[in-house]
Amino acid sequence: NWAERYGLKILIDLHTAPDSQNGFDNGGISGVCKWSQEPEEVEFELTVLERLAQRYGRREGLWGIEVINEPITEETWEHMGVQERYPAVDPVKAAGTKPNTLEFIRQFYLDAYDRLRKYLPEEKYVVIHDAFLLKAWKDFMREDKYKNVVLDTHQYLMMAEGMGCEQTVE
């Protein structure tokens, strides 16, 4: 009850998914990115989001829920050289690793939004990450039925290094 007691607002952020959404060290296991290839793990993630919304959705201290942190797409995977930058700590587990498609991430966000909104009031925010492709989201979830959706972007120098300063500045 600290958030309510001290007037704080909390953003719950799922920072990783089973078998990682990005292959980064902060994605759970460096060098592995297989989450989107495993339907049971995708469903697990959606169920966790739903349970969080069910448990905390009506709490005054909850500002919102971020669906997943920094999922990586094919384009960013190539530009960053993820497999060289983040060598696999478990080469056996990393076998078959590949990035998420933008289409998969978009569908996951739509599914997550629907599952969250079953329990999360409209005044609470649903936060989605731009997957390091800020321009790709210009018209996504713009329809009136999507309430209080926030696009999260992380501007890292390593992205400017890999993708060019133009996208970073824009």
Predicted features and spans:
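Extracellular glycoside hydrolase catalytic/binding regions
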Residues: T47, Q54-G57, G61-G64, I68-E170
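An active-site-proximal structural segment forming one wall of the substrate-binding cleft
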Residues: N1-T16, S20, F24-V67, F108-R115
